[in-house]
């Protein structure tokens, strides 16, 4: 199993901030925004959480979730939460026209957030499949096995649940 520790991951900080609606110029009428490297922003992108999921913010407020780090700027996740929030707030002012201070903020840092499917990554997938094949009751699922997106992880979990159910039926 120690081989799986060699999978390279990008670190990411998730920064959730709430604002009074009148302090955000952008209509927030979509999913969010990805911030391409050419824009020279600190954050990778921002999701308009309260637009996507009603009830995520009190009436008259909005909730925004930004992501910092990745392979583009892994050093940013080593900063203090105050420094990370300062960088994100600068970006939100630029991209969304935020004028006020956050009414709420929460930062989570994930040192091993996104597995990198580098050249040769297939050896990890092969190892997982072989290990599952020779280890009764061992099943792998998730972003390190079947894709990094949330959708990929859901499908991976569903498929693993099916394999587990089949295994349990066959062994009982």
Where are these regions (language model features)?
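Mid-domain catalytic core of redox enzymes
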Residues: 1-64, 69-82, 87-90, 94-95
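A short coil-to-beta-strand element that immediately follows conserved catalytic motifs
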Residues: 12, 28-29, 97-110
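Hydrophobic residues at beta-strand termini and immediately following loops
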Residues: 46, 105, 141
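FAD-binding beta-loop-beta segment adjacent to the flavin cofactor pocket
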Residues: 52-59, 110-140
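Short FAD-binding loop at a beta-strand-to-alpha-helix junction that anchors the flavin cofactor
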Residues: 63-65, 129-148, 152, 156
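Surface-exposed helix-capping loop/turn segments at secondary-structure junctions
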Residues: 94-104, 166-172
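Internal hydrophobic alpha-helix adjacent to the cofactor/substrate pocket in enzyme cavities
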Residues: 153-172
């Amino acid at each position: 199993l120690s081989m799986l520790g060699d999978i390279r991951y990008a670190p990411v900080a998730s920064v959730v901030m709430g604002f009074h609606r009148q302090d955000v110029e952008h209509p927030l009428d979509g999913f969010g925004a990805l911030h391409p490297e050419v824009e020279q922003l600190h954050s990778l992108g921002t999701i308009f959480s309260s637009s996507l999921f009603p009830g995520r913010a009190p009436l008259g407020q909005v909730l925004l979730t930004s992501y910092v780090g990745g392979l583009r700027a892994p050093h940013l996740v080593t900063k203090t939460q105050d420094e990370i929030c300062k960088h994100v707030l600068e970006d939100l002012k630029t991209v969304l026209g935020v004028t006020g201070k956050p009414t709420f903020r929460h930062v989570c840092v994930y040192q091993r957030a996104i597995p990198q499917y580098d050249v040769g990554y297939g050896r990890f997938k092969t190892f997982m499949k072989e290990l599952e094949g020779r280890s009764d009751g061992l099943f792998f699922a998730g972003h390190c096995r079947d894709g990094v997106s949330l959708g990929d992880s859901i499908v991976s979990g569903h498929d693993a649940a099916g394999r587990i159910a089949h295994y349990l039926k066959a062994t009982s």
